Amino acid sequence: MSIMTASERASQIWGVLGLAARNRQILTYEMVGRLIGVPARGLGHLLEPIQSYCLTNGLPPLTILVVQEATGLPGPGFSAANAGEYARKQLDVFAFDWMEHGAPTPEALGRAASERPSRGSSAE
């Protein structure tokens, strides 16, 4: 059995988050980790390609749907919006048709993370 790359895992997470957005759901890191079979700790590096792809392509910040259980807020690596914008950005994510957009390939996600590293850096 081969081990999945970070970009392949990010592609899995994209599908989970696309469905969550359609259902107007917020997920915790623990929930996402259980759904894809990885520990919640360290999930941030798997979310980065998605965040980078959204930033690069002018899409709503899909990763805003993943929050810390204790705070209800995205983790420290989330940089696609500032705290004052979270509620509005979540609504943008809910309103976007992720099924129509479709999931990017693992290669496209990996390329976005390489071209625009986003974990903990400013979205501006």
Feature locations, PLM:
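Nucleic acid-binding interface residues in structured DNA/RNA-binding domains
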Residues: 2-12, 18-21, 25-124
